[in-house]
Amino acid sequence: MAKTSMVNRDIKRKKLAEKYAVKRAALKKIVSSQDATYEEKIEAATKLSKLPRDSSPSRHRSRCELSGRPRGVYSKFGLGRNKLREATMRGDVPGLRKASW
């Protein structure tokens, strides 16, 4: 089980990313625009750098919903590999079963 503080920190990062998503996308569009002047691009880049660091979506780490494990997470199910295996063996995941050939 992951530390509660790490899980909470990740939840906070996800909320911040959602909060600033529109503003961040608008500034990124200006920075990558061909039509914007050099001064506009520099201004947009400085505004982008002044946003909270944790508001970047790349700082969010996908975690297992049950255990909070940060690695080996299947995004389709939201579970780590160990918990996904346990759920599959119990028959909780429809259409998923152990491979046999």
Curated annotation (Swiss-Prot):
SUPFAM superfamilies tied to this protein: Glucocorticoid receptor-like (DNA-binding domain) (SSF57716)
Keyword Nucleotide-binding: no
Residue numbers spanned by region Disordered: 48-69
Compositional bias annotation for Basic and acidic residues: 51-68
InterPro entries the record matches: Ribosomal_uS14, Ribosomal_uS14_bac/plastid
Gene3D superfamilies hit by this protein: 1.10.287.1480
One annotated GO molecular function: rRNA binding
One GO biological process term: translation
Keyword set includes Zinc: no
Keywords on record: Ribonucleoprotein, Ribosomal protein, RNA-binding, rRNA-binding
GO cellular component: cytoplasm; small ribosomal subunit
Sequence similarity: Belongs to the universal ribosomal protein uS14 family.
Biological function: Binds 16S rRNA, required for the assembly of 30S particles and may also be responsible for determining the conformation of the 16S rRNA at the A site.
Assembly, per entry: Part of the 30S ribosomal subunit. Contacts proteins S3 and S10.
Name under which the protein is recorded: Small ribosomal subunit protein uS14
